[in-house]
Amino acid sequence: MKALKKLFTLALAALIAAGTTLCVSAADIGPYSENGKIISVSHGGNWGEYPIYSKAAVESAFELGADCVSVSVKRTADGQFVLCKDNDLGKLYAPYKGQLISALSLEQVSQIRITDSFGALSDNRLCDLADAVDAAKRFDRTLIIDDGWEYRKELYSYIVDKDAVSNTVIRTDASKGDIKEFLALTGGALRIVGSYYGNIIFNARSYVTSLSKAGCAIVELGTKNPFGVIFNKSMLSAFGKNNYLTRAMISTYDPDLCGQRTDTESTWNDLIDRGYSVIETNDIKGLVNYIGRISSLRTELMTLTASAEKLDKNNCSAKSLQEISDAKAVAAQALTTLSSHEALAEAKHNITLALNDLSVSNENHVRKGVLKISAGKIIAVILVTAAIVAGQVYTYKMQRKKKAAKSPS
């Protein structure tokens, strides 16, 4: 009981002081992410509630806790940038079929009302890049710019002028040679996400290794194949070569980018345990909640591990010590690597069971050479002794009666 009370006290103290998070150097985690942190990317902003590529969608995603928002950009006739996937507005917003962003000025584009996810006209307008960058800076988050590689030099100048280099990333599926050239041109000041889509392991490994050496911040991998090479841990080990800190990214919002998987927690569990630390999703609420629960589990697991370290091993059986040692090893592995919610929950379950078994067994184990006597044990000994004496008296009387019956009168 004392051990159990001790465990509860330690757990309570740790939970009260649980304002800090586990810090593990990137070198200790090999091919995975620094501090075991999973990065959430909202594809197009929170367009479940607001029209995609609207200012409200971008800001809402950041408010929900997204680390990054990915947006596509197009350039207007007067050289300004707005958020949109296609130059033809009609491909995204039916009422404007045939209207090209490249043929309109920024002022004209800003007057266009865009449709919501149900196709109804809203009061929202297309967000220009300036507003999106300002939102990223205000929330101290990151904007990932897609489809802007052809404007990369102009975008770089624009981002520098906005003092937003630390809040902006450009994503491209350009060749590794073009990406390396641009990184060299900018001195690596602007972060780049290089994207490889395919299923040839030699090409994928070469792409990852080359861009890692060049200082690419993130490399995204994608394939339609459910059993593609990008899901192979030996492939993902390329991210850990020579201690480069490049992160592995995957997009789950489109099944064609993640081997026909769904944009759900079960998929995130699987991909994180394979080595992906940056996930792009359409369900930003769900992913942010999932990452939050991972953080809580890490804190709980650290608390339980600390409790296991401080238990008095003199009161433990050899079997209990082995069980707790095995559980601690699993917990340490989960805490010092990139781990999914599922992996952390399993580690917590194992160490909780070991501690519970240990707290019960402590009541039944006595240290060698120490006699432990309690009032209950004394009473039990007295009762057993009394029963033995009563039995002997009864037997003696019965024998006397039998002898008396056999004696001649």
Identify the function of each model-found stretch.
Residues 1-28, 364-409:
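Gram-positive cell-envelope targeting signals
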Residues 9, 17-296:
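Phosphate-group recognition and catalysis centered on beta-loop-alpha active-site segments
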